[in-house]
A protein has these predicted regions:
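Glycine-rich phosphate-binding loop
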Residues: 152-191
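Glycine-rich oxoanion-binding loops at beta->alpha junctions
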Residues: 91-93, 97, 136-157, 201-203, ...
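Glycine-rich phosphate/diphosphate-binding loop of Rossmann-like nucleotide-binding domains
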Residues: 103-148
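Short, acidic/small-residue loops that bind anionic groups at enzyme active sites
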Residues: 82-86, 178-202
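C-terminal binding/interaction regions
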Residues: 112-116, 154-156, 163, 193, ...
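Long amphipathic alpha-helical segments
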Residues: 1-76, 82
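Short glycine/serine/threonine-rich phosphate/pyrophosphate-binding segments
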Residues: 44-46, 117-122, 146-147, 168-178, ...
Length: 249
């Protein structure tokens, strides 16, 4: 009976008119918080959804939100709410004052091939940190100057990360290089950076899918949120297992 009640609680859905059905207990059920997508929503609807999530969970995370959406949320949010906005990538986190992210002990490495890949990497960073992970990052270390990579990759390895997110556009070569060196899972993120033949991330995605380095998984083009969630799930499972192993005879 207790297990059944727990399942019902963790499956709770909050309906907002005929607008949205919020999976408010997603994080307790599967370890990943619900992330509200700003694309395609009016500023008013987005603010209503975001503030309901804030009310229910103490925190709301919004991705791909424009300045109008940010403005609507800011205008209607409680005055004591903590609002963290990265307007360069359209990412917003709003929290109640008593909400604190529990640190899990999970560690993630985060690399980009170029400066233009940073916005997608920042999506991954924010998601992973909101899932309790520490993120060790190094940007603009791609194969056009491969010597830039090794010092930063050595530091990431020495910090004993549990997974690494590698973000690259154009030919998308960096993830395969990294996966051929390290002994932890690598999540590759192709970006839409690049032009000409194979533009908009097509070459990068194809190259990553064709990579011969094992231990490499690929998300969709510009899929920073997905990559951050996957990397954090891996890292948090490892951290939990390490913690449990301390008490094994």
């Amino acid at each position: 009976m207790d297990d059944a009640e727990k399942l019902l609680r963790t499956s709770a859905i909050q309906e907002i008119d005929n607008l949205a059905k919020l999976d408010v207990n997603r994080e307790s059920r599967k370890g990943v918080p619900e992330i509200i997508l700003g694309d395609g929503k009016t500023p008013e609807d987005l603010a209503k959804i975001t503030l309901r999530m804030l009310s229910e969970n103490g925190r709301a995370i919004v991705s791909r939100v424009d300045m109008q959406g940010i403005g609507a949320i800011r205008e209607t949010a409680p005055k004591d709410a903590i609002l963290e906005v990265n307007d360069k990538i359209g990412m917003l986190v709003i929290k109640k004052t008593d909400f604190h992210v529990k640190k899990t002990g999970g560690k993630i490495g985060l690399l980009t091939a170029g400066t233009s890949d940073i916005p997608v990497a920042e999506e991954a960073r924010i998601v992973a940190e909101e899932m309790g992970c520490e993120v060790i990052s190094a940007y603009d270390v791609g194969v056009a100057g491969i010597h830039r990579l090794f010092t930063h990759l050595r530091n990431i390895i020495e910090r004993e990360v549990n997974s690494i997110v590698v973000v690259a556009g154009r030919e998308g070569a960096l993830p395969a290089v990294v996966a051929g060196i390290v002994n932890v899972p690598v999540i590759a993120v192709p970006t839409s950076v690049g032009y000409g033949l194979g533009e908009k991330g097509i070459s990068a995605l194809t190259a990553m899918l064709q990579a011969c380095s094992l231990g490499l998984a690929v998300v969709n083009i510009d899929g920073g949120v997905a990559a951050g969630a996957i990397a954090a799930l891996i890292a948090n499972q490892v951290a939990e297992a390490k913690g449990a192993s301390k008490y094994q005879p």
